[in-house]
């Protein structure tokens, strides 16, 4: 946290400490599974935001921006649909304050061979 902004990097969809299903979307991972994992990434990120807010006697004011990474082959064109799951999660949690600008990037490989990952910045406000 710096100047009431939380910087979260590299949120993977870990379950019981590790990424359960690995590989590229449409090769080893279905779009449905990628969407499920994207929601888990968002849930983990939101949990970290809640901890940061509590530790700083604040509440989560808004999501400032979101970066979504999808590991897939070069022909796959559905990365925005997968990213929508994270965006929807934050909007459901924070209402209009969950709306955010977003970048969505397709890559050939992510850490731990995860299919999806997110980074974000969020603002906190003193209670």
Predicted regions and their residues:
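Short, polar/acidic, helix-capping and beta-turn segments at strand->helix junctions
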Residues: 1-127
């Amino acid at each position: 946290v710096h100047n009431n902004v939380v910087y979260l990097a590299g949120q993977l969809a870990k379950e019981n400490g590790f990424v359960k299903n690995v590989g590229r979307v449409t090769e080893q991972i279905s779009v449905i599974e990628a969407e499920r994992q994207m929601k888990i990434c968002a849930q983990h990120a939101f949990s970290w935001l809640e901890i940061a807010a509590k530790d700083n006697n604040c509440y989560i004011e808004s999501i400032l921006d979101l970066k979504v990474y999808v590991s897939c082959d070069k022909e796959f064109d559905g990365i925005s649909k997968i990213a929508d799951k994270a965006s929807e999660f934050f909007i459901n949690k924070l209402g209009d304050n969950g709306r955010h600008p977003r970048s969505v990037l397709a890559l050939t490989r992510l850490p731990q061979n995860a299919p999806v990952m997110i980074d974000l910045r969020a603002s906190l406000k003193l209670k």
